[in-house]
Amino acid sequence: MNISSIQEQILKLKKEKDVCILAHSYQAHEILEIADYTGDSYKLSVDASKAENKNILMCGVRFMAETCKILSPEKTVYLAQPIAGCSMADQMDKQLISQVKKMYPDYTVVAYINTTAELKTICDVCVTSSSAVKIVNNLDNKNILFIPDCNLGDYVAKQCPDKNIKLLNGGCPIHACVNVEDVKKAKELHPNALVLVHPECTPEVVAMADYVGSTSGIMNYAKKSDAKEFIIGTEISIAEHLQYECPDKNFYGLTLKLICPNMKSTTLVDVYNCLNGNGGEEIKLDDQTITDARKCIDEMIRLG
């Protein structure tokens, strides 16, 4: 079957089986086209909780599907591609952070939403890249342990100078691989383009940007800006999606190194097979994990 034929079958099956399809912004455009909701990980989780469907199919990575299950425990949640993990989320586990917490007993543990459900159970509050600065500023405690992304943590620390923020060595290996030379080369090729980067990039790269923000922030900025050319410093698919949505502007990926293999592991065929009962994986979390992990997400909503 060609792409359009598979898409037609998917649309038919999701209606028959009462499935809401969620697709992260880093997914291929052909997957976004069959999704009920698209966006970043937290937005998709909220969308899932509001959807009337009994079944949720996540086209993204495992921690995103887990977050959907935490926010919608009464629903059946599937991950379209079981091997789609997240290198950042897998860097730190509950055992490690439990030991670190003993070293910093008076610190509030702030966890990027890109963490496992198990790790969320021992954290005080979750944040997204778009809400991190606001939430950290709103915390009563001056002492913060920010996990797992040290680059995002560094960005937050610079925006929150009154806070004492402790960082651990972790983060997104894809965003972290971008260097100053990559930015210089991109600007040489496109001297009139604005540089928009994600705060998961290194501090040196962030310092060279015209705008720093979350995936949704980058997309909104580019759409609303009067500028006509943009260098996009996040997963390469965002430049592709923006080019599709704004054909009167030009978008350039900062570097071809910005390709997330985990996000790219999900295909239309995976979605089709999952809906057919021949693929995917149901996300199962025990009641205690859901209850404990939900606390830091609820705190994020309260402070954000």
State what each model feature region is.
Residues 1-232, 238-304:
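Active-site loop-to-helix "anion-binding N-cap" substructures in soluble metabolic enzymes
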